[in-house]
């Protein structure tokens, strides 16, 4: 049986490497579904921002192509971007955490999309960090996509009360 699992693992690796880069279409190396050239061109700039006793960990600048990929993943059910987005999150140097808390979405958005994009990414990150997912937060308000920025921040803070 171990021989078959080794053969299966080797076959999966070969098939995985033969898949094209999701950004440029050429055969890729194994970097979260993109080739090395495309990975190096992503606007990745991991940093930590300290705001009001909170540490906010940022993966990169919200500009092309990241902004486009995030919008497709979030609004257009382009779930094939999951490996790339998860890989980007894995590049952030996070302190030791006890759990991952995904941002909840409204029941209306969950019904529209059929999935919670932050939960999908949280599962990958929790697995990598070997920590549980914790969901103490419940969205009290409907979606806030069209709400002014200040109102969005207010809704965010209210969700954590």
Region roles according to the model:
Residues 1-161:
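Glycine-rich phosphate/pyrophosphate-handling loop used in enzymes and phosphotransfer proteins
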């Amino acid at each position: 049986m171990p021989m078959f699992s080794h053969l299966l693992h080797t076959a999966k690796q070969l098939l995985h490497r033969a898949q094209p880069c999701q950004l440029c279409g050429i055969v890729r190396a194994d970097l979260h579904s993109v080739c090395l050239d495309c990975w190096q061109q992503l606007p990745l700039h991991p940093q930590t921002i300290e705001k009001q006793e909170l540490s906010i960990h940022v993966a990169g600048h919200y500009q092309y192509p990241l902004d486009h990929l995030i919008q497709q993943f979030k609004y257009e059910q382009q779930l094939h971007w999951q490996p790339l987005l998860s890989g980007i999150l894995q590049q952030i140097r996070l302190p030791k955490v006890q759990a991952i808390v995904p941002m909840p979405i409204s029941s209306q958005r969950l019904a529209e999309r059929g999935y919670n994009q932050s939960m999908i990414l949280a599962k990958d990150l929790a697995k990598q960090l070997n920590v549980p997912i914790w969901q103490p937060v419940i969205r009290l308000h409907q979606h806030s996509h069209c709400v002014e920025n200040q109102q969005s921040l207010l809704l965010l803070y209210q969700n954590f009360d």
